[in-house]
Each structure stands twice: as C-alpha cells, then as structure tokens.
Amino acid sequence: MVEMTRLDIAQGDFWLCLEQRLAWEGVADETVVATVREILKAIRCRGDEALLEYTQRFDGLEIARAPELEIPTSRLQAALTAISREQREALQVAAERITTYHRHQKQESWSYTEPDGTLLGQQVRPLDRVGLYVPGGKAAYPSSVLMNALPAKVAGVSELIMVVPTPKGEMNDLVLGAAAIAGVDRVFTVGGAQAVAALAFGTESVPRVDKIVGPGNMYVATAKSMVFGQVGIDMIAGPSEILVLCDGKTDPEWIAMDLFSQAEHDEAAQAILLSPDGVFLDKVTEAMARLLPTLERQEVIANSLRSRGTLIKVENLDQALEVINFIAPEHLELSVEDPQALASRVRHAGAIFMGRYTAEAIGDYCAGSNHVLPTSRTARFSSPLGVYDFQKRSSLIQCSPQGSQTLGRVASVLARGEGLTAHARSAEYRLKG
C-alpha cells in the first residue's frame, strides 16, 4: 500500500492545499548554526591545526600532519584503474557528453565601437580557483564530481580543488576516478563545515578559493550560506523534486518508477504526478504498490511519498501548465503527445524532460545537461549550474577624444544634479573650451 495525498484542482481549497504540500523548512536549527559558526571561527583563526582536530573528531581520521590530508594525483589514477571497465567507460561517456553540452554555454567577450570612436563592451574571464565539495564515505556520487567539475573546466578555471570526507580512511574509487577523468587539480580528505571553511578562508595546506560548489548535508549548506559574500557559492539546495505531467497514455509502471527515482533520495524529497486522467492516477498508484517492495530503499520511498508525495487531477493541459508554473519544479517530465509544444509554455522549471522515453534519471547521469538544479520553487528566478557560473564579466569603456566631449557634458549635468561636484569636475577637466 502506497500512501499519497490526492488533490483535485476543482476543489475549493486546492491552491492552499498545494502550498501546504510544497512547504519545506530549509532553515538550519540553532544548534547547527552555532556549531557551524564555531567551526568557521576556529578554521579562520587556527587554520590547519583546527582542520586536523575536526577531521579527527568527525571522520575518525588519524593524520598527524595537515599535508597528509591531500590525496596525490597518482591515487586518483589508481582509483580509475581499480574500478570496473564498465564503470570506467560509463564515466567517460558521461564526461564527454557533459563537456559537449556545456561547451555550448561558454560566453565570449564582445565589444562595439560608436561612430566617434568610443568603444564599449564586455570582457569575460574565468574564475581563478574553485572549490568542489563532494559527499564521501559509503555514499558514492561520482556524477556530482562530473557535473560540478566539468563546467568549471570548460569555463577555463585555472585550478579546481576538491574536498571529500573519508571517514576512517574509507575512500570511494568511483568518486576519485571521476575526479581523475574530470581533471580535478587537487583533492583533500576533509569534509563537513570545516572543509567549507578551509576553502573559504584558506589554511596553510588548503588554498583559498573564489567560489564553492557541490552538495552536502545541513552543516555543509549552513557553512556555505555563512561564507557567501567572502566567496561565491552555487546555491543552497533543498530536497530533490520531480513533477511528472502525463496524459494517461504512458505505461503506469514507467511513471511509478520515475516518481520513485526522486523519492528514494530521502524522506524530504518530493514526487508529484499531474494528470487530466483520474483513472490513470489510480493505475499509477496500483503500479507503485506492486513495484515498491522490489526496491532496496522502499522504506525511504514510502516515507517520502507519505509526507510529501502528491497526485493531482486537472481538467486539461492548460490547467496543468498553471500548476507547473506555480510549483516551478526542479525536474519536470512532460510525458505527453507533443512535449516540445508544451515545453515552450513552461516558464519555470529547472530541467524539462520531454516525451515518454526520457527518464529523469538520464539527466541525472549522462544526457549532458547539468543535474545541479534549483529546488524549492527557486526555478522562478534561478537556473541550472553551468559554465556561466564559473565565468565573470568586466565592462569595457574607452572614450575617444570626441566621445569624451559629448559624454563628459552629459556626465557633468547628471553629477551636479546629484550634488557630486568631484564627479562632475572629473568629467569637465577633459572638456575643451
């Protein structure tokens, strides 16, 4: 038996009920905040000494000297050799596709020259150094390494520093192998808020970075939010989400498994199915009941579906689009006859998976698009991680002698209107006559 809340857009309190289902408290509790604040202060003040202490305390890693925290590149290559041929080839295929996709995103510098010779433009440059946080231990997320590292490499980032916790020295060869394929420059066996602090402030051994990307637990997310402003960050991600719109003509078992694919992340993950066909909603529910016992993470999935999973009945696809754009889902599947036409009407979604044969899991691993996506309705104003996140822009302005006369007079008038005399005179000193 699968328990999921069922809503109908025709019910009077539909939008209120939907908002309640979407609500998620993403703020860390006071204990977490206090702990993270203490860790950040210690790393900032005592550097490697504090980093070693926290690594020994939280990861049980007995290392006497901080330089031993760095994993040599030879170990990354050894990990790549140690994994199975099938895994190695899968990582390489995924890496090639991710690189190809992200090359299309790369922004270039541009400029134009006005008739009087004044030049205006924009110079695009990569960040110097980026830090990548990767969960470690028994969890293996090589896909996160590829998705975060490869766009940075395409952007031209000079140095990519990866941090990954290795509890009791346990290293994951898939993760290290992915780092080798992605061209990560340096890897350190540190994790948690202390790793974020080391990247943000720098220590004697860990270099300070310009931006920190990558997923992590509540302590990592809280640390990232606290150091933001001193360094850039990608985003503070919430639980994983999927919204599937189906017209009722796709195999119910396919849809059931698509919903499971996100619900298995954790109990806070959210899976929503939207359909104008009420009978189809019943069929998917029946399929989930059959398939759930076959899955290793069935308890996590069941809890996720019970707490946040939702089945929504709409009258037509126009109503479905209204709901989709309200939810602004992280992952959106359009399992309908003409998905491209429908996709053009979607205003808010992290990634749109079009057609009956496009499982969301393909995007998680190897389609080529990035799986780091805005969650918790932030797709209303945010975008997937991309090359542009690892580039920055500088404005270019060069006035010709003639241009300085025309623009100088305009600047003078506006500056004096604001009461900024030095601004005005700076422009006026270049005026002739």
Swiss-Prot record:
Keyword Amino-acid biosynthesis: yes
SUPFAM superfamilies: ALDH-like (SSF53720)
Pathway the protein takes part in: Amino-acid biosynthesis; L-histidine biosynthesis; L-histidine from 5-phospho-alpha-D-ribose 1-diphosphate: step 9/9
EC number, UniProt record: 1.1.1.23
Positions annotated to bind NAD(+): 133, 194, 217
Any one GO molecular-function label of the UniProt entry: zinc ion binding
The keyword Zinc appears for this protein: yes
Short name of one Pfam family: Histidinol_dh
Gene Ontology biological process: L-histidine biosynthetic process
InterPro entries associated with the record: Ald_DH/histidinol_DH (IPR016161), Histidinol_DH_CS (IPR001692), Histidinol_DH_monofunct (IPR022695), Hstdl_DH (IPR012131)
Keywords of this entry: Amino-acid biosynthesis, Histidine biosynthesis, Metal-binding, NAD, Oxidoreductase, Zinc
Annotated residues for binding of Zn(2+): 262, 265, 364, 423
Reactions that this protein is recorded to catalyse: L-histidinol + 2 NAD(+) + H2O = L-histidine + 2 NADH + 3 H(+)
NCBIfam families: hisD
Function: Catalyzes the sequential NAD-dependent oxidations of L-histidinol to L-histidinaldehyde and then to L-histidine.
Protein name in the entry: Histidinol dehydrogenase
Organism of origin: Nitrosococcus oceani (strain ATCC 19707 / BCRC 17464 / JCM 30415 / NCIMB 11848 / C-107)
